[in-house]
Amino acid sequence: MDLYISHDKSKRLNIYLFGLFFYTSIRIKERVVNLMIKFGKGVVKHRVLILIVAFALLIPSGISFINTRINFDILSYLPSQIETMKGQDIMVDEFGTGALSFVILEDMKDQDIETLADDIEDLEGVKDVIWYGTIADSTLPREAIPDEVYDAFNNKDANSQLMLVTYSDTMGSDETMEAVNKMDKMVKNHCFVAGMAAVNADTKTLVMQQAPIYVIIAALLSMLVMGITMDSIIVPMLFLLSIGMAIIYNLGTNFIQGQISYLTLALTAVLQLAVTMDYSIFLWHSYQEQIDRYDGDKKRAMAHAISHTIVSVTGSSITTIAGFVALCFMSFTLGLDLGIVMAKGVVFGVIGCVTILPALILACDKVIEKTKHKILMPDVSRIASWVTNHYKILAVIFIVVLIPAIYGYTHDQVYYDLAGTMPDSAYSKQANERLDKEYAMGATHIIIAPSDMSKADSINMINDIKKVDGVKLAVSLDSILGPTIPDDMVPDEAKEIFKNGDYQMMLVSSKYETASDEVNNQITEIKKIVKNYSEDAMLIGEAPCTKDLITITDTDFKRVSAVSIVLIFLIILVVFKSVSLPIILVAVIEFAIFVNMGIPGFTGTKLPFIASIVIGTIQLGATVDYAILMTTKYRKNRYTGMDKKPAITKALADSTNSVIVSALCFFAATFGVGLYSNIDMISSICILLARGAIISMFVVVFILPSMFMIFDKVICATSAGFKNKNLTA
């Protein structure tokens, strides 16, 4: 009896606690909703002030953006603690040299080369100019120079000579790129400037010319899509104006990072437009619904539309931000650069969507009404019934396609040669090809060794390096002079170039191209030799840095993929209070990514290394928006008492148009830029994103509802908000 009473009291206590929790939850939810409505009413009331402030903020944002430095040196984003980057710092600190270029001189006499060398050396940013005449002066005759050194700087068959130019700052500095541009003008008729400094200079020229065009293309194509899929000409313009202002705010706040990469600059506006367009579309659709609800009271309708948009967009925007935040976990800090800027962009996009855009719509209400037209896109919501009737077939297609998609995804070919991203018309690319053709010269390595290394060790180390496969030339000051020439016969200029303070510099010329398997194996062998002679010696240069880039980004990709999946999994878990939905949604979205990234594995298309890292996170973040929209409607329908099939069919029918419009805008913005850009890194990323938008659209419209049909019982049993106990009682 006592046990029975105790159990009864416990049961009543549990009922009481549950009731209290339920009541508290409802009250909190009501307060949040009321707060959002108050915010919406505040925006409507102060819409003129909001527009004045918004337009005024464009001025400081624009000034800040103009004064934000753009970094064109991708390798500078490698971790500072690795040996190649430490060696780079030593080069700058000890030798006053941060980069080098090879200049191919055709049909020029020695006296003309000497004059040109003096002119180049006078350029701001140039430290030294080295050619065989630098060493072979009046005190050291030509006959004293080893034939291999002379041949490395001369090609009698092509009647050309080679000049090595070193710069006082790194290859991505403004001073170095300006020096390269001036040098190009000086030597353009009969000479070619090769090397990464020249590639960076060409990249800067192309990006600064093309970046504004990217924005124009993305905006025009997005407006074309919205013009077809919406009932107004003016509203798409207001969308673009609102998003454009958010983009300027985002770019204007990049000063907090000191600088941004050229890749971030080129992609930010396009991606922010494509990713945040969803929020504008949602606000407009919600506004239209609220107008019907409140009998044409547009101010009240807008206040409630803002409230609904904030509540609905919060979950999807957080997941999108999470995808970009995952990039910040990369050791290769280009990910941090892009991740921070894009995460900020989403935040500014959401803020603009619930403040600036409503104010613009209300301000332009009369014009909007006058310019309305018939929607040209057919109503595609009818496919919902077909999907729920054929979900088993679609589930089989999912499984059948998944296996080859994963195979293709794991067999993608990736390239790391940064010079390879340039178009064939780029002057630096032509110079690099000529350098390879006339001098069989691919990568150039630099050895930084202690200056007190004995002459014998220096010569022996160089001789050992010469035996490594693919080494065309290996020289130190000691190896050039040999054991018989005394130091006092060496020109002071040559001494200062190769030896300075605590370190000496040695050059190794490779026949292999940067980022190739052959050169990476060569670097490993040379490092072993160098370390045998001195633990303090370092091997640096473009190829060793690129080898580190390969190793680091391979680890980064796995880390970023894991972090992005975990973050989005947790966000879906919290938003839907479900154990099963995060698994289903992430699995379906990853399937879309596998299909997109698996296609190049079958076509044999080589992708730039950064593409695989960036695409995964951006497509994950963007696709989850579509998935959350449909899942929210599915949950609402089930909660109102609808059976499985009608609930899923209605959710799909209500979501399809929004998903298609959003995906097509994303596709249009990125595909247009991908076709136009002749910088392969930018073009490849945009084409992949465009294709990913279409694939994600099909997956969300066809595969996700099929998963809901199959796992409905599991979802309802493991998720909050799918069952209304008042209806089932």
Predicted regions and their residues:
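Structured non-transmembrane domains adjacent to transmembrane bundles in polytopic membrane proteins
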Residues: 80-197, 413-581, 587-606
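Membrane-embedded transmembrane helical bundles of large multi-pass transporters/channels
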Residues: 1-70, 76, 168-416, 531-729
